[in-house]
């Protein structure tokens, strides 16, 4: 059976922790930032843990994990 490919969009956007949680960077950070408050932009920093259901979907797209 051939090897399964990892979706390249998943490689770019997500990270899997050692405990199996999936981290994703928040959206709405590229343009039109002047319309958002400073508080909203500040709270949008860092990574967020995906829900369990979304994490399972991401793990299906990355069958061998993400390094």
Swiss-Prot record:
Name by which UniProt lists this protein: Large ribosomal subunit protein bL35
Organism: Granulibacter bethesdensis (strain ATCC BAA-1260 / CGDNIH1)
InterPro entries per UniProt: Ribosomal_bL35, Ribosomal_bL35-like, Ribosomal_bL35_CS, Ribosomal_bL35_sf
HAMAP family recorded: Ribosomal_bL35
BP-aspect Gene Ontology terms: translation
Span list, region Disordered: 22-52
GO cellular component term of the entry, any: ribosome
Keyword Ribosomal protein among UniProt keywords: yes
Biased composition (Basic residues): 27-44
Sequence similarity: Belongs to the bacterial ribosomal protein bL35 family.
GO molecular function: structural constituent of ribosome
Alphabetic keyword roster: Ribonucleoprotein, Ribosomal protein
């Amino acid at each position: 059976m051939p090897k399964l490919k990892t979706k390249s969009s998943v490689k770019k956007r997500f990270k899997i922790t050692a405990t199996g949680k999936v981290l994703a960077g928040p959206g709405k950070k590229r343009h039109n930032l002047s319309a958002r408050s400073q508080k909203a932009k500040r709270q949008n920093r860092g990574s967020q843990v995906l829900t369990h259901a979304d994490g399972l979907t991401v793990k299906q797209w990355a069958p061998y994990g993400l390094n």
